[in-house]
C-alpha cells in the first residue's frame, strides 16, 4: 500500500523518511524525528499511520498535534491526497467548538489533526473519545 501511495503522489522517500517509517512500523517504541521544515516529516509519520490505523474503526485512533491551523489543514490535505481511505479532521481555534464537534460526529475521523488548545477543548468537553487513541504525533 505504501508503494501505491508514493506512486500516486510521485514521491521518492529520503533516508530520514525511510528510517522513521521503519522505526514506527517495526518497533513498539517512541520515535523522535528532528528535521528541518520541508524535509518530509509529515509523510514520515502519515505513511506508517496509514498502515497501522484500522480503517474499519470509526473512532479516532491517532492525534496529531500541530503548532498552528495551517499545518493542521495541510497535514489533513496530505492524508486525503494519499488516497489511503482514512478519514481525518483538522481542529483549530477561530471557529466554534460546537460546529467542529458536529462535523466530527459526521466525519468520524480516524486521525485528528489540531492545535494544542483546540484538542484540549475537545478532550475536556468529551467531544473526542480518547479511549481508542493508539498513536500521538507531536
Regions found by a protein language model. Give the residues of each.
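Walker A/P-loop NTP-binding motif
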Residues: 18-29, 42-57, 73, 78-82, ...
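The conserved Walker
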Residues: 35-39
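Conserved pre-motif I regulatory segment
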Residues: 1-34
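Conserved P-loop NTPase nucleotide-binding/switch module
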Residues: 138
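Conserved phosphate-coordination/catalytic loops
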Residues: 11-15, 43-44, 95
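Conserved nucleic-acid-binding Ia/Ib motif block in the N-terminal RecA-like helicase ATPase lobe
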Residues: 3-4, 57-124, 132-135
Amino acid at each position: 500500500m505504501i508503494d501505491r501511495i508514493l506512486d500516486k503522489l510521485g514521491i521518492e522517500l529520503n533516508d530520514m523518511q525511510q528510517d522513521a517509517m521503519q522505526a514506527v512500523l517495526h518497533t513498539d517504541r517512541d520515535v523522535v524525528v528532528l528535521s528541518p521544515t520541508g524535509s518530509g516529516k509529515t509523510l514520515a509519520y502519515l505513511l506508517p499511520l496509514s498502515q497501522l490505523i484500522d480503517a474499519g474503526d470509526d473512532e479516532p485512533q491517532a492525534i496529531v498535534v500541530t503548532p498552528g491551523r495551517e499545518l493542521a489543514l495541510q497535514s489533513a490535505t496530505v492524508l486525503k491526497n494519499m488516497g489511503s481511505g482514512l478519514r481525518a479532521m483538522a481542529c483549530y481555534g477561530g471557529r466554534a467548538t460546537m460546529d467542529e464537534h458536529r462535523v466530527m460526529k459526521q466525519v468520524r475521523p480516524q486521525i485528528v489533526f489540531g492545535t494544542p488548545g483546540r484538542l484540549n477543548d475537545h478532550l475536556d468537553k468529551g467531544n473526542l473519545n480518547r479511549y481508542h487513541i493508539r498513536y500521538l504525533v507531536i
